[in-house]
């Protein structure tokens, strides 16, 4: 067990990490283009933050959090998502005094004790954005368009946008009465978890993944059809904004998202390329969350996407990733004098911003050239006593095989051409 990664975790090896570098670079560019600034939050927070923020009736809080007592007997939890930590930081650091909206993004690892399956891990990578202070549907449209543009830039096809509105506390209270009246005759057929949710948070039953519960809720009254005027107008504004940008969408009355903090707009981007639970990105508005966590009433909206699932979609669709940069040159050296000269030359090349490699294992010249080929070096040079004495060597283009004698003094300028 000592030499095996814990269940639900995965090493990202050098042969794969270039794909992550590409996605991370595209994330940074996207967020820059939309005016979002990066925030870095702690890996762990006080457990109460997630109980209050995520919701103590959610699967995440009830079943999936990694929670422990620290040496001071404080209850600490590894972050299961990013929003609650960003909200805490927004409050603690007085960001309400900044020009609004405050637009933030993060690229983090998160931790949930989930059933491990393809694309779902217990340690996973999550990219998310949060925007605070804008109450109208325009920011909802911007957030959704941001995800759409990101997928377009990555070349992802066959991904659909589903939207819904789950209202505000006012219309949700009225809706909950209707939902409870509908569910009450079927309580015995609901799973044990949903039976506990019936009184505390009946809306959460709509989100249950158990087949028996899904059958019962399939014909339940839809919250989107029971909105108050304010929520209805907000949803109409969202739809009009998406249509104005030419973004296709479908209304899915069953989207409630798995977190209690959502209000009004909720949305998911779904792909058929990763199995039954094909959500790649999800998000929505949370107008009461900042206040619930101890701040002033502040509207907010955000999204999060799992990067493991994003990678699965890209690979399943055959999308090519730009390969990692190969060494500009490999310097092969034979003999102590040549090796010493090569060490200095490699250092000088690296100081100039060039990627240079040399043998560190005492291999033969033939083995060194084979190694240079495996590294994918663009050029190679072989050094021995004769080359050092003359100050000249043969520069070989490893792709074409073309060879040309050059002065060693001009090597840096030639490689920079």
UniProtKB/Swiss-Prot annotation:
> Which keywords appear in this protein's UniProt record, sorted alphabetically?
Aminoacyl-tRNA synthetase, ATP-binding, Cytoplasm, Ligase, Nucleotide-binding, Protein biosynthesis
What is the E.C. number?
6.1.1.21
PROSITE patterns according to UniProt: AA_TRNA_LIGASE_II
* EC class: ligase
The answer on whether this UniProt entry bears the keyword ATP-binding reads: yes
Q: Which reactions is this enzyme annotated as catalysing?
A: tRNA(His) + L-histidine + ATP = L-histidyl-tRNA(His) + AMP + diphosphate + H(+)
A GO CC annotation given for this chain: cytoplasm
Q: Which InterPro entries match?
A: aa-tRNA-synth_II, aa-tRNA-synth_II/BPL/LPL, Anticodon-bd, Anticodon-bd_dom_sf, His-tRNA-ligase, HisRS-like_core, HisRS/HisZ, HisRS_anticodon
Instruction: Name the major location.
Output: cytoplasm
Question: Mind telling me what this protein is named?
Answer: Histidine--tRNA ligase
Question: Which species is the source of this protein?
Answer: Acetivibrio thermocellus (strain ATCC 27405 / DSM 1237 / JCM 9322 / NBRC 103400 / NCIMB 10682 / NRRL B-4536 / VPI 7372)
């Amino acid at each position: 067990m000592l030499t095996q990664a814990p269940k639900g975790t995965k090493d990202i090896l050098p042969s794969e990490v270039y794909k992550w570098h590409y996605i991370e670079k595209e994330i940074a560019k996207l967020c820059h283009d939309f005016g979002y600034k990066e925030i870095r939050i702690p890996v762990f927070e006080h457990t109460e933050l997630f109980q209050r923020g995520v919701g103590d009736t959610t699967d995440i809080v009830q079943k999936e959090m990694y929670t422990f007592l620290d040496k001071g007997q404080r209850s600490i939890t590894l972050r299961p998502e990013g929003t609650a930590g960003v909200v805490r930081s927004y409050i603690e650091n007085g960001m309400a005094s900044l020009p609004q909206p405050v637009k933030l993004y993060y690229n983090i690892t998160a931790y949930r004790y989930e059933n491990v399956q393809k694309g779902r891990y217990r340690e996973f990578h999550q990219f998310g954005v949060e925007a605070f202070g804008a109450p109208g549907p325009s920011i909802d449209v911007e957030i959704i368009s941001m995800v759409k543009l990101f997928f377009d830039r990555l070349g992802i096809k066959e991904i659909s946008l589903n939207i819904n509105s789950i209202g505000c506390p006012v219309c949700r209270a009225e809706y909950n009465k209707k939902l409870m009246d509908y569910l009450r005759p079927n309580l015995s057929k609901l799973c044990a978890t949903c039976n506990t949710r019936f009184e505390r948070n009946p809306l959460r039953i709509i989100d249950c993944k158990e087949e028996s519960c899904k059958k019962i809720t399939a014909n339940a009254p839809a919250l989107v059809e029971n909105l108050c005027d304010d929520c209805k107008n907000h949803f109409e504004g969202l739809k009009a904004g998406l249509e104005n940008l030419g973004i296709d969408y479908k209304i899915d009355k069953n989207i409630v998202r798995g977190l209690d903090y959502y209000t009004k707009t909720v949305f998911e981007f779904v792909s058929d390329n990763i199995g039954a639970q094909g959500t790649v990105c999800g998000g929505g508005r949370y107008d009461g969350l900042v206040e619930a966590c101890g701040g002033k009433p502040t509207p907010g909206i955000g999204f999060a996407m799992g990067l493991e699932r994003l990678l699965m979609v890209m690979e399943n669709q055959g999308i090519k990733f730009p390969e990692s940069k190969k060494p500009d040159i490999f310097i092969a050296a034979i003999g102590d004098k040549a090796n010493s000269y090569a060490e200095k030359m490699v250092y000088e090349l690296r100081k100039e911003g060039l990627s240079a490699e040399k043998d560190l294992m005492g291999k033969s010249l033939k083995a060194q050239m084979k190694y240079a080929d495996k590294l994918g070096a663009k050029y190679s040079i072989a050094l021995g006593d004769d080359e050092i004495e003359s100050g000249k060597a043969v520069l070989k283009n490893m792709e074409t095989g073309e060879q040309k004698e050059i002065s060693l003094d001009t090597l840096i300028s030639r490689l920079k051409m």
